[in-house]
Design a protein with these regions (language model features):
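Extracellular and organelle-lumenal recognition/adhesion modules and their flexible linkers in secreted
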Residues: 19-195
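Bacterial Sec-dependent N-terminal signal peptides
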Residues: 1-26
Length: 195
């Protein structure tokens, strides 16, 4: 009896592994899924909708009431970019995005301390839109350890990305760093609450 149960459980486990392995094949080579709850998003390669070439990548929410986000991303060493300015650009197409969609990039230092970040939250892709090019520009400080980037979808909808490019740019190209744009005041103010 125990042997029969073991065989049944083993078959079920192998079947589950093979099913999930098939799902992993949808993720493009060199990329991985992440986010607050990536299982709420279908992600993969699309051979019917693309900006150029033969393929694009897409994220689609499975839950119409989702408040989560999913991302397809890569992480690379910052070593070749230390002290330089980089641009992530790419084309995005969207369908019925009720939350927000974007390309994003983050520069991390020691212990994953964020040194630069832009997820296009202040200029997010919403609704239904045809292919449009977007750009993110960040400085890579000398103490950077990794560069992380990708495409994300927050909430309900579907987003495609194609022709992403990461390249060096010169100082004449302004940074889009959301951390830099949210400067803290130099002095305390209204401590008596009278203003």
């Amino acid at each position: 009896m125990k042997t029969k149960l073991f065989v049944i459980l083993s078959i079920a486990l192998v079947t589950a592994i093979l099913m999930f392995a098939g799902e992993d094949n949808k993720i493009p080579k060199g990329w991985f899924a992440a986010g607050s709850n990536p299982s709420e998003y279908e992600m993969g390669i699309d051979s019917t909708t693309f900006q150029n070439g033969q393929f694009s990548v897409y994220l689609k929410s499975k839950n119409p009431k989702s408040n989560e986000f999913g991302t397809l991303m890569q992480s690379i060493s910052a070593e070749n970019y230390l002290g330089k300015r980089i641009m992530l650009s790419g084309y995005i197409k969207s369908e019925n995005i009720e939350g927000w969609g974007a390309i994003w990039m983050r520069i991390d230092g020691e212990d994953e301390n964020q040194l630069g970040f832009d997820n296009m939250y202040n200029r997010a892709v919403k609704g239904t839109n045809d292919w449009k090019k977007y750009e993110i520009v960040l400085d890579v400080p000398s103490n950077s350890k990794s560069i992380n980037y990708g495409i994300l979808l927050g909430g309900f909808g579907k987003i495609w990305a194609d022709n992403l490019n990461l390249k060096l740019v010169d100082e004449s190209v302004p940074v889009t760093n959301l951390m830099r744009n949210n400067k803290l005041p130099a002095e305390p103010n209204n401590l008596d609450f009278e203003e």
